[in-house]
A protein has these predicted regions:
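Long protein-protein interaction modules used by eukaryotic assembly/scaffold proteins
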Residues: 2, 14-17, 85
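Short aromatic/hydrophobic contact patches that present stacked aromatics
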Residues: 5-7, 36-38
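Short, surface-exposed ligand-recognition loops at beta-strand->loop->(often short) alpha-helix junctions
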Residues: 6-14
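Helix N-cap motif at beta-to-alpha junctions
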Residues: 13, 41-45
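Short, flexible N-terminal segments of the mature chain
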Residues: 14-36
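Short amphipathic alpha-helices in soluble, non-transmembrane regions
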Residues: 19-25, 48-56
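Extended, non-catalytic scaffold segments that flank or surround catalytic motifs
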Residues: 31-37, 45, 51
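C-terminal structural segments of small proteins and small subunits
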Residues: 54-86
Length: 86
């Protein structure tokens, strides 16, 4: 199992992104910040990315999936605490 940070920019705010939010719920992602989520999964980053990307319909949308190592050196205030529970 690995923890991934998922970050996105939705470039078309008036578009219906509910399918993306449902996809995040389906993989049991936790909402960390406005457009940042965390997920603990046995799937590789590419699988997570491809699954979510199919729910983003604007070619200008941005999606970033990166491993988050709990032992990594980082600084956060009121955000990363939730990721430690994944």
């Amino acid at each position: 199992m690995a923890v991934f940070l998922i970050s996105y920019d939705l470039r078309k705010p008036d578009y219906d992104y509910d399918p993306l939010y449902e996809a995040l719920a389906n993989i049991k992602a936790k909402h960390v910040q406005d457009s940042v989520w965390g997920v603990n999964t046995s799937s590789p980053a590419k699988v997570v990315f491809d699954y979510l990307w199919q729910h983003m319909h604007n070619e200008k949308d941005r999606l970033f999936v990166v491993p988050f190592d709990k032992a990594s050196d980082y600084k956060s205030e009121n955000a990363i605490t939730l990721l430690k529970t994944l």
